[in-house]
């Protein structure tokens, strides 16, 4: 079974890099919109994956899960992403999950095809890293369970995950698509996002 895990910060803390560009209410609404898009995409992808899958939201915000059918909530008791994901990994492995796919909750253009590519890449690899547009952060991470790979989300996390996988003797690879790599981390990207949603009836699938 595949476990798609979507970690989300407290809404008022999310997208802090945009604090000078958006007021708190607009920033929070932006985050909710992106989270809902990621959840919808993950739910649609489940029917296309080669093995059964479940979706978990790891967050101190339970309403995000209760508002979304088919989403299971894992409370984030750690208040630190890597610790929260480590705890989530233990819990979903106990539930029978064999493949864990961590998907950032703030990917506005992620598609079903992106998740299929991530799943397919795990056929021949123990670890698959999908970096952000700078090649530094990790927007998605796939791994087989059980796994000793420590989570290292943060600065240069893509490189960290690849180096650590190699040190542990794990087969690892990168995948990258424009929609999976797109990350709203500055004003230019924010304007690109607004231009796209203004010209599209729906996000790309």
Curated annotation (Swiss-Prot):
Enzyme Commission number(s): 2.7.7.105
InterPro entries xrefs: CofC, Nucleotide-diphossugar_trans
Matching Pfam families: CofC
Domain of life: Bacteria
Reactions catalysed: phosphoenolpyruvate + GTP + H(+) = enolpyruvoyl-2-diphospho-5'-guanosine + diphosphate
Pathway info: Cofactor biosynthesis; coenzyme F420 biosynthesis
GO molecular function: GTP binding; phospholactate guanylyltransferase activity
Record's keyword terms, sorted: GTP-binding, Nucleotide-binding, Nucleotidyltransferase, Transferase
Biological process per Gene Ontology, one example term: F420-0 metabolic process
Enzyme class of the recorded protein, top EC level: transferase
Binding residues for phosphoenolpyruvate: 138, 154, 157
Other remarks in the entry: The exact nature of the substrate is currently not known. This entry has been annotated based on its similarity to Actinobacteria.
Family: Belongs to the CofC family.
Function description: Guanylyltransferase that catalyzes the activation of phosphoenolpyruvate (PEP) as enolpyruvoyl-2-diphospho-5'-guanosine, via the condensation of PEP with GTP. It is involved in the biosynthesis of coenzyme F420, a hydride carrier cofactor.
Protein name as catalogued: Phosphoenolpyruvate guanylyltransferase
């Amino acid at each position: 079974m595949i476990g798609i895990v979507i970690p989300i910060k407290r809404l008022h803390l999310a997208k802090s890099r945009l604090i000078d560009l958006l007021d708190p209410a607009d920033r929070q609404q932006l985050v909710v919109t992106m989270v809902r898009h990621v959840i919808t995409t993950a739910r649609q992808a489940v029917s296309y994956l080669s093995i059964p899958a479940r979706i978990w939201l790891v967050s101190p915000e339970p309403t995000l899960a209760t508002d979304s059918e088919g989403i299971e909530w894992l409370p984030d008791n750690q208040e630190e992403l890597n610790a929260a994901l480590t705890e989530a990994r233990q819990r979903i492995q106990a539930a029978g999950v064999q493949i864990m796919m961590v998907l950032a909750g703030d990917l506005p253009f992620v598609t079903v095809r992106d998740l299929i590519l991530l799943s397919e890449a795990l056929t021949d690899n123990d670890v698959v890293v999908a970096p952000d547009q700078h090649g530094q952060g990790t927007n998605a991470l796939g791994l087989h369970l059980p796994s000793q790979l420590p989570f290292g989300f943060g600065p240069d996390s893509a490189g960290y995950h690849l180096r650590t996988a190699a040190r542990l003797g794990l087969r690892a690879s990168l995948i990258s698509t424009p929609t999976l790599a797109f990350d709203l981390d500055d004003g230019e990207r924010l304007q690109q996002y607004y231009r796209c949603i203004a010209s599209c009836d729906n996000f790309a699938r």
